[in-house]
Amino acid sequence: MVGSPRADGRCATLANEMFEACIDECPEDGVSVVAVSSVDVAPCVGCDACRKALSKDDDAYPEIPEKGDPLAQCNLVFRSDASAHQCVIGDDMAEVRKHLDAADELIVVSPVYFSGAPAQMKALLDRMQPYFWSNLRERTKERRPCTLHVVREGGDPHGFEPLVGVVRSALGVAGFKLECLVDWLGCFDEDGEIVADGRECELD
């Protein structure tokens, strides 16, 4: 998962290198990249449909629409006929969820914007809310490993703890556990090329 809104920046360079390395080292495994720069994911609007959909098995709720107006009138389906963690907003988040559900491991590469995630990345993370409601009954499931690679300039005196917190929280409800944090400060040259390895940091 690449959290930068720039399609060809340093995060993309790092993600592409890791993608190629994964293919070379584990050719039998499937590897996919989800970049916020190339997906259409709207922010959560707090409509509460995902919570209401899971309140009772017999309650009807809006069917997932095709891409388009998220507020458009939808048909109703029953809870028992649909996935447990769907959102009524019709955009690319449905495809993102398919990748998350199929993943055995997750790697996140993100820049730091004012100590936190870019708006596009934050919007995607906020859309994990349906997982929260569906997982209220499934807390015992084993979580899959997640690694966060932080690409930053280092000029913010407040660090990047807010980024770590939101990634850990949002992906936690999606079934992942943040196990490794890698800081790439000073590891890129002026042209955006990788010149050094990232440094693994301790997680609180």
Which sequence ranges carry the predicted segments?
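Short glycine-rich anion-binding loops that position phosphate/pyrophosphate groups of nucleotides
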Residues: 112-114, 153-154
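N-terminal beta1-alpha1-beta2 submodule of the flavodoxin-like/Rossmannoid cofactor-binding fold
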Residues: 1-109, 115-133, 180-182, 186-203
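Short amphipathic alpha-helical segments, especially helix-boundary/capping motifs
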Residues: 101-102, 110, 141-146
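Short, glycine-/small-residue-rich phosphate/pyrophosphate-handling segment
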Residues: 119-120, 137-181
